[in-house]
């Protein structure tokens, strides 16, 4: 599943090609602290990033997020008219978000009939939305969740993360996860991405939930979880190798590939769920951290979500260090919190707070843009943020 172009035939050749920039010394001391694997066993082969003449990525890229709910997509003309009057230049639209299915792709018929049955839109309904976005001159990013897929596990329990008896195990967020070690799952998600590119015309595929489930340590310690690790890989190896496989294939279709990672991935260790920033950034075209201030733990009386500028400033300092630890880093384009805090005192996030997040990113050198996460896709909220989005830097 990995291209032969990355294979060296001798140790001397491997050392010359793979460690040209001395990057392995950086990662050598980062062992397997949390069960996700060690950093040294991952791949840092310098990769030439894609730059398609007929598919130019906005720089910076400022995107708003849309679900695939029919009620949201019915308002696509309103979202487009709004974006035309601001500096917004891109849309992120769900192809698949767990059990929320964008359209009835024939790929589902083959791999996951249950997903096909529950599609929110027909192919033509969904295509009209993406075509309107592109016809209006906006960059179209298709968001596709990978290893959080209860429908697929229902159809293929043999590929699901299982309990000690071989039955699918409900894990994070009360959902079922196919194993990231299973190549059939890789094939399925890449086939779905290809269909979205060919049928809908997306400029970029963004993989989310490209990780193992978090908070599985209690099962691992008790020996009551089976990840179906057929090839004896670490979690981080499986995640990076999936991204290598997917990126190489999707580049053949002239589209960029992005990956979302938890905010924790900016730390200098391999996370328990297999995300390691330098290894992901080295492979994909765009890396998107998710440092939502209300997802950070409080420190005594200090609530990070009440200090969005300082929180993003500190986080980006760490993420920038990880970017420097790989020979071919991806473009940084960060998910920012564009919704009111979900922790007490439930701070409102408006022009000031979201502007502070953006300022924290830029002051640490993250200038690739942002994507504003608001799961409600509220037009009223967008109007409140108009002064901010009108004044964004070119």
Regions found by a protein language model. Name each.
Residues 1-47, 387-391:
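Boundary regions of SH3-family modules and the immediately adjacent low-complexity/disordered segments
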Residues 139-149, 206-213, 233-273, 327-341, ...:
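Aromatic-lined carbohydrate-recognition surfaces of secreted/lumenal glycan-active proteins
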Residues 75-101, 197-207, 283-288, 361-370:
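Catalytic domains of carbohydrate-active enzymes, especially glycoside hydrolases
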Residues 62-71, 108-123, 172-187, 228-237, ...:
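The substrate-binding groove and active-site-proximal loops of carbohydrate-active enzymes
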Residues 52-71, 128-131, 142, 147-195, ...:
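Active-site-adjacent "subsite" loops/lids of carbohydrate-active enzymes
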Residues 86-121, 214-222, 382, 389:
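Aromatic-lined carbohydrate-binding/catalytic grooves of carbohydrate-active enzymes
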Residues 103-114, 149-172, 210-229:
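Aromatic- and acidic-residue-enriched segments that line the glycan-binding/catalytic groove
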Residues 284-298, 307-313, 318-394:
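Substrate-binding cleft of secreted/luminal carbohydrate-active enzymes
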